Amino acid sequence: MNCRSEVLEVSVEGRQVEEAMLAVLHTVLLHRSTGKFHYKKEGTYSIGTVGTQDVDCDFIDFTYVRVSSEELDRALRKVVGEFKDALRNSGGDGLGQMSLEFYQKKKSRWPFSDECIPWEVWTVKVHVVALATEQERQICREKVGEKLCEKIINIVEVMNRHEYLPKMPTQSEVDNVFDTGLRDVQPYLYKISFQITDALGTSVTTTMRRLIKDTLAL
């Protein structure tokens, strides 16, 4: 199985990290979640509905749509909060990345553990910029909103391609494909990781600074 890989890059102010990352992660998971499966008998099931809600950002001129699952939202906020704190405490240039990996399990014979086979990975590279004035922050608020809108549109375009998704499992195999631990939604199995690094390029940050500078010059 070939694993699809998508890479996004964003440049944000420190207080925008959490909202930007939640917007991206929630958008991806909105398209990689189903309602809960209700099995009547093996091979016959119905799928519940997935509720959605709009989220208005406080520090970015942007509104995104997420699955209306408080459990899923708490899980994402926890890991994004850890990422934000790690960026803040890194003492470097505020460079890092988060990866959202979707996978399915392949049963192995005892005593070996199940094999996790990734089929799609989303990586978001983040560079935190330091701004000196409130005017710069206001411009950044608008520009990040515009850039984030472009990223979300790109995500939706990728999701609409007719590419591989794990086939719908039987009742006995549903835990190999979906996370059934949430009460109100059923995302494909996923895991989120992050790292703080100084190996990322500065092109995105340079572009953001130029946008702010050009706007101030108007």
Curated annotation (Swiss-Prot):
Effect on the protein upon substituting residue 152 to D: Abolishes interaction with ATG13
Q: What are the UniProt keywords, alphabetically?
A: Autophagy, Cytoplasm
- Principal place where this protein is found? cytoplasm
Known InterPro entries for this protein? ATG101 (IPR012445)
Cellular component GO terms, alphabetical? Atg1/ULK1 kinase complex; cytosol; endoplasmic reticulum membrane; phagophore assembly site
The record's subcellular locations are: Cytoplasm; Preautophagosomal structure
Looking at the keywords, is Cytoplasm present?
yes
A biological-process GO annotation: positive regulation of autophagy
Pfam families in the cross-refs: ATG101 (PF07855)
Question: Per UniProt, what is one GO molecular function of this protein?
Answer: protein kinase binding
Coiled-coil stretches, from where to where?
Answer: none
Q: Where is this region: Important for interaction with ATG13?
A: 152-156
> What is its biological role?
Autophagy factor required for autophagosome formation. Stabilizes ATG13, protecting it from proteasomal degradation.
Family the entry assigns: Belongs to the ATG101 family.
Quaternary structure annotation from Swiss-Prot or TrEMBL: Interacts with ATG13. Associates with a complex composed of ATG13, ULK1 and RB1CC1; the association with this complex requires the presence of ATG13.
Q: What is this protein called?
A: Autophagy-related protein 101
Top-down, what is the taxonomic lineage of the species of origin? Eukaryota, Metazoa, Chordata, Craniata, Vertebrata
